[in-house]
Amino acid sequence: MSVVGFDVGNENCVIAVAKQRGIDVLLNDESNRENPAMVSFGEKQRFMGAAAAASATMHPKSTISQLKRLIGRKFREPDVQNDLRLFPFETSEDSDGGIQIRLRYMGEIQSFSPVQILGMLLSHLKQIAEKSLKTPVSDCVIGIPSYFTNSQRLAYLDAAAIAGLRPLRLMHDSTATALGYGIYKTDLVANSSPTYIVFIDIGHCDTQVCVASFESGSMRVRSHAFDRNLGGRDFDEVLFNHFALEFKEKYNIDVYTNTKACVRLRASCEKVKKVLSANAEAQLNIECLMEEKDVRSFIKREEFEQLSAGLLERLIVPCQKALADSGLSLDQIHSVELVGSGSRIPAISKMLSSLFKRELGRTVNASECVARGCALQCAMLSPVFRVRDYEVQDSYPFAIGFSSDKGPINTPSNELLFPKGQIFPSVKVLTLHRENTFQLEAFYANHNELSPDIPTQISSFMIGPFHISHGEAARVKVRVQLNLHGIVTIDSATLIEYHKENITSEEMISEENHQSSAMKDGSLDPSSGSIGNEPKAIKRMEIPVVANVSGALTKDELSEAKQRENSLVEQDLKMESTKDKKNALESFVYEMRDKMLNTYRNTATESERECIARNLQETEEWLYEDGDDESENAYIEKLNDVKKLIDPIENRFKDGEERVQASKDLLKTIADNRMAAESLPPPRKNAVLDECHKAERWLHEKTTEQESLPKDANPELQSAEIRRKADALNATCKYIGKSNSPPAKPEHNGSYGSRKSDDMELD
């Protein structure tokens, strides 16, 4: 069993695997370490990764990318609408307010949710891992942005289930980076006090910042901060808008009106950005951008930095917020690490160096650090790996509260159940006085931390039904968990009834102020007094809990999505097999045409050559016309038809070559047996020599007969016949050589024609 870490980025994906000697990043079929996060739909087949990226320019409306911007989101969210205006593919709103991606596939318009598309991408990454490792892949850790909401995290788990993966954890990107950094940095724990490191991850579509502390054998994330809408693609968009305006004035073309032109210009702008990261200036040249017009332009790094000034200023905000939430001063920070695909712009490094008053570190691989950290975490969680003890404490970036039909539920100190910065996984136990079915709701306590129009409600839980015999002497204990994935769940609800006379009014939980006690698992209810005075329970009963979780697929929906994915995989495999058979037929036609003109020319008659040449030409024309899009069986039948004509000629040629070698082998067998016969008694020696002479004479006669025939005639002497003769000679000579008595001479017994031989004894 393998343990794998997946970094599913907005632009690219990276796969890392934990091995005994360390962490390795896997290569795809193109020998690249990064896999484009794209899924493209052809007429009858899907294409993933690099194959999808290759078709993005030609088929933009059927190529899906930037899934992280859509997963677990609602169609009408402002951020989603801003993104959809940039995407070339068609979308619509489903019945639940979610997003549906519409495209043409298998001759009809089909709809897919972002969860289904992500499931396809994860399935592709899983296939790459299994092909490289030559073993099934199931257990994994998947990196996610720290700002993902509960519904987005659930969507990732659903997508992983569709792909046949079992995530042991959804891990924050920056936490994974910190783990991969800290577990190898033994110098960080030289001092007795913690070492504080800031990690800034500027990705394709977002910026994440975290402050982590490192001690001997452990790390803790003290704060997370982020800008959901600031990444490398925004700097690309600055260049795109600049050149689009310039081309409108210079060439009188409006690229905004042409989908393919937009895709091509954005791809070129990304290349220009990379050139400007290492050079002071860059050129842009695109042939036939639109209206058959070639465009060219030029930009300097200084101009690009001026155009990006607003974006650079926005980078300061999450950095300052992360530092403030950590409660640390700038002087306490040991170092600052900069990672992410968008971190290579010189102006970004310069601005952040000025902010933190130090040079930025780049000691981790900017593109692979998340995947490597996820693989490490997977190894720690998997039972099949032994990893040295290293504790990872992550913090949750949102404050989560609970409420019931009687009002908000807080801790005895009047705090939220899971305040912002809560270390998770975390379990709290609520002790409530209820007499019948009730409902709990989980919600984000601060809507300002969320994107606009994202609902604050997370999920609701119906607890019950249940029946109690002593109403005033019963309590319901609810076990609430913020689990390893950062998802809010209720593990269990238990009804506990006590002896009525053992319960005083002070021992009951007062809910007049709409509060209940909340404590960590295993601690005492503050209202219950000491352990010795705790009333004795007379009845415990598990209460059913029904969750209504926003953003999660139901069991039926998940099962249907899995079945649909399986059918799509079967179709892909069918098309790949059909493509292989078509390529095999095409290769066979070209190969045989060449051999008929050269290798097989002398072994075929004139009429055979003409017939085969005509058939090969007809097959080639069929391939490029009527047979361009045929079934797998059609290609197999065509190949068999051509082979029926070729096989006799091919057999003549091959048998002619093999006949020469078989003759040499028979002559060697004859020589070997003659040499072995020298050590035998005279009668057996003569018998062996006689058999060798017969075989030699047979070969000479047959060879002479064969050589008298033309090369294009069917052979009279076949190589298989010669090999059988050699085997028979060996067997006969071996039989004679092992006999205990010599062969008997013929004797006259009665009449002249009557002969009798002695029986031979075998060893």
Curated annotation (Swiss-Prot):
Entry's family note: Belongs to the heat shock protein 70 (TC 1.A.33) family. HSP110/SSE subfamily.
Residues bearing the modification Phosphoserine: 528
UniProt GO MF annotations: ATP binding; ATP-dependent protein folding chaperone
Protein name in the entry: Heat shock 70 kDa protein 16
CDD domains: ASKHA_NBD_HSP70_AtHsp70-14-like (cd24095)
Composition bias, Basic and acidic residues: 701-714
Phosphoprotein keyword on record: yes
InterPro entries in the record: ATPase_NBD, HSP70_C_sf, HSP70_peptide-bd_sf, Hsp_70_fam
Location of region: Disordered: 509-529, 701-763
Keyword list, A-Z: ATP-binding, Chaperone, Nucleotide-binding, Phosphoprotein, Stress response
Superkingdom of this protein's organism: Eukaryota
